[in-house]
Structures are given as structure tokens and as C-alpha cells.
């Protein structure tokens, strides 16, 4: 007998939300170091909005340890493969480098912005998966992180 779908750990993250501001401003928040520090709580970022640009974000290591992932924080980095100003970002060959453990990757990060009335429909998807407990735990943890960060992004941009 297979487990109910709700009990299956996620193998990617995807969320869509409506933000009351122009798409160009939403997309810009994924590249502006000051904005990234506010909504994503990053301590440092290097993000280049062009094909083959670097996309790297660093967080302070946590003091507590996850049983499977170790300390959280560390660096997420990849290569910008596609960038359409105000509309789309695609980062490939992305990896999470935790403070103390082995990297997790490769992954992809997709961000799209669509005008909807006077607002922006933001879609964020992070994918890439290896069938292991560590990967499943990673997606369970980042889902909470993304949800909190995207809520902060919305609040930051709607002020």
C-alpha cells in the first residue's frame, strides 16, 4: 500500500503569489543586494542579471543543527542562463553549500513575473532531485524558508 500523497516529502518547491507592484520591481528585488538582505535575510549576495552571470546568495550559519542537513545557512549559487528584465530568471547548475556538510545539487531556480491588473503574479520554482532522505529533507526545510522569504518580499515591495 502506498503512502497518502500528503505524507510524501516534496521533491521540489513551487509557489505563486500576487504582489501589488510592477513586475520589473519584483524581478529587481532578486538582484538588488540591499533588497535581498531584507527579504531573504542574506548576509551577502552577488547576482548578475545577464546570461552566464553569477547568482550567489549567502546566509549566516545557524547555531542549531538539522539531523540530516547539519547547520543551515551557507551559500546557494548557480549560473544565470536566461534573464528577461522584469519577466524571467532561470538559474541552472545551482548548488547549496551548507556550512559543514556536503553540497546539494545540481538544481535549477526559475522566477517569473507576469503583469496581472496593476499587480505582479510571481512564480518561484526550485527543482532538481536525487532520491535520498537528505534531498527530501532539504526540500521540506527550504519550502518553509521560501514561504517565509516570499511573504517578506511581498511585504517589502508593497510598503
Regions picked out by a protein language model, each given a short descriptive name:
Residues 15-17, 45, 76-82, 107-115:
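Hydrophobic/aromatic beta-strand elements that line small-molecule binding cavities or substrate pockets
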Residues 155-159:
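Short, highly charged C-terminal tails/helix-capping segments
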Amino acid at each position: 500500500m502506498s503512502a497518502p500523497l500528503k505524507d510524501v516529502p516534496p521533491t521540489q518547491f513551487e509557489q505563486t503569489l500576487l504582489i501589488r507592484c510592477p513586475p520589473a520591481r519584483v524581478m529587481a528585488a532578486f538582484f538588488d543586494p540591499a533588497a535581498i538582505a531584507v527579504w531573504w535575510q542574506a548576509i551577502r549576495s552577488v547576482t548578475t542579471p545577464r546570461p552566464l552571470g553569477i547568482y550567489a546568495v549567502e546566509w549566516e550559519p545557524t547555531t542549531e543543527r538539522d539531523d540530516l542537513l547539519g547547520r543551515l545557512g551557507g551559500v546557494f549559487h548557480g549560473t544565470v542562463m536566461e534573464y528577461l528584465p522584469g519577466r524571467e530568471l532561470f538559474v541552472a547548475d545551482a548548488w547549496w553549500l551548507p556550512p559543514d556538510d556536503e553540497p546539494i545539487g545540481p538544481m535549477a531556480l526559475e522566477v517569473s513575473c507576469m503583469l496581472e491588473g496593476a499587480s505582479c503574479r510571481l512564480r518561484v520554482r526550485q527543482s532538481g532531485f536525487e532520491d535520498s532522505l537528505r534531498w527530501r529533507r532539504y526540500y521540506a526545510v527550504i519550502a518553509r524558508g521560501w514561504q517565509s522569504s516570499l511573504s517578506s518580499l511581498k511585504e517589502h515591495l508593497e510598503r
